[in-house]
Design a protein with these regions (language model features):
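C-terminal transmembrane helical hairpin of 12-TM major facilitator-type secondary transporters
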Residues: 281-325
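Helix-breaking motifs and short loop linkers at transmembrane-helix boundaries and internal kinks
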Residues: 44, 76, 97-103, 131, ...
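Cytoplasmic helix-loop-helix junction between adjacent transmembrane helices
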Residues: 107-148
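C-terminal membrane-cytosol helix-exit motif in multi-pass small-molecule transporters
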Residues: 175-195, 385-390
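Paired small-residue
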Residues: 87, 91, 102-110, 305-313
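Conserved MFS/SLC helix-loop-helix module at the cytosolic interface between two early adjacent transmembrane helices
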Residues: 63-101
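Helix-to-loop junctions at the C-terminal end of transmembrane segments
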Residues: 65-76, 267-279, 363-364
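Juxtamembrane intracellular "pre-TM" segments in multi-pass secondary transporters
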Residues: 2-8, 190-220
Length: 401
């Protein structure tokens, strides 16, 4: 076997383990959506207040990107993913054992801090290991793990919410999954190259500034923060919305919204053909249209059964849009890819924290119409704006010598 073939085989095995890590991280990102009504009941809180378990995780996840990204560039991305996985074991176990709501929120902060190093540094590792022309398709493999986890987390959250095991059982299940993947990742580290020598390193703040100075990076980062606010924020309250509007059980509401991830998986399977046929500008444009139309359809749907097919279309549109953003995040500053992808994730999850905060207050005090109408208007506008910016960026890049 040639050295190149051996390296490709090693990379394929590592990508498989990273996809497993992304699965459990994706589950952690969405499992509390379906648990919110159960948490509200168990701790005598409103759904909006119970949403602090999502806000705290998202804020910690976003803020820790500013540390994990530079650490990945310094000490090796796969090594930092492995450390993060062991941190997730501790964080999820602590959440399962939390004695009260405030302790649970605090432990979700710790869990979010650890989880911050898993998916973004996995993306950055792929950016280093896979040429750009094959990167969309390879990122789609990681996306399959993430989306499978999101779907499983949404479903499991609803099932646990309706069972005697409750939220503690949900978190203990994730602890066990993290433990398996952490051990597999530890075994993969034997084939990883050594981190760069000290002379090749630059200060953390300089790494962040170097990425921020790139005009295109600022466009990508602003766009993904908008996605966090208007897509992920309201999405957290959709199971509670279906439960309240149609009287569905939490497991049934969660199962319908879990089809969001199935739509994303459909994109991941078809990604190479979609990229060739549509191109990136039309992908983000149509992604924005599908997301916005989906939120409007959720608002207007006369029966609960329509929520599932709508979720599937929204999921497909999301990843037309998001995977294009994600691919550009790996190219914002190739020499500092870990920092670039970490800043991308920081903006996404700070946007999500803002969005969940606004959505929770809206849901508690104003109801479902503004909760769903805001994304229905904002997401198509964001897709149109980024599509225009992307075309201008391509034109400038093609005009350079």
């Amino acid at each position: 076997m040639s050295a190149t073939a051996a390296a490709q085989r090693r990379h394929s095995a590592t990508i498989l383990v990273l996809a497993g890590a992304a699965f459990f991280s994706g589950a952690a990102l969405r499992i509390c959506d379906s648990l919110l009504p159960r948490l509200a009941q168990d701790f005598s809180r409103t759904p909006g207040t119970a949403g602090r378990v999502i806000i705290s995780f998202a804020l910690a996840y976003g803020l820790m990107q500013l540390l994990f990204g530079p650490l990945g560039d310094r000490y090796g991305k796969a090594r930092m993913v492995c450390i993060a996985l062991f941190g997730c074991i501790a964080g999820s176990l602590a959440c399962a054992l939390a004695p009260n709501f405030d302790a649970l929120v605090g432990m979700r902060v710790a869990w979010g801090m650890a989880a911050a190093g898993v998916i973004p540094l996995s993306l950055a590792w792929i950016g280093d290991a896979v040429p750009y022309e094959r990167r969309q398709a390879t990122l789609a493999q990681l996306l399959t793990g993430t989306l499978g986890g999101m779907m499983a987390g949404q479903l499991a959250g609803g099932l646990f919410a309706d069972s005697a095991l409750g939220w503690r059982g949900a978190f203990l299940t994730l602890t066990a999954g993290y433990a398996v993947i952490a051990v597999l990742m530890l075994l993969r580290l034997r084939g990883e190259p050594a981190p760069p020598p000290p002379g090749a390193r630059i200060a953390f703040a300089s790494q962040l500034r170097a990425v921020w100075r790139e005009p295109w990076a600022r466009v990508v980062l602003a766009t993904v923060m908008t996605e966090g606010v208007f897509l992920l924020g309201p999405l957290a309250y959709l199971p509670a919305y279906l439960h309240q509007r149609y009287g569905l059980s939490l497991s049934a509401a969660s199962a319908l919204i879990a089809l969001y991830a199935v739509g994303g998986l459909a994109y991941a399977i078809a990604a190479p053909r979609i990229v060739r046929r549509l191109g990136e500008s039309r992908m983000v444009l149509w992604g924005g249209v599908l997301m916005g139309a989906g939120y409007l359809a959720w608002l207007l749907a006369p029966v609960a059964a329509l929520a599932g097919p709508i979720a599937l279309l929204v999921g497909f549109g999301t990843y037309l849009y998001h995977n294009t953003l994600q691919t550009h995040a790996t190219q914002m500053a190739p020499a500092l890819r870990g920092t670039s992808v970490a800043m991308f994730a920081f903006c996404l999850f700070v946007g999500q924290a803002i969005g969940v905060t606004l959505a929770g207050a809206t849901f508690d005090h104003l109801g479902s119409i503004p909760l769903l109408l805001g994304p229905a208007l904002a997401l198509p506008a964001s897709g149109w704006g980024f599509a225009r910016a992307l075309r201008r960026h391509r034109t400038r890049a093609d005009g350079q010598p």
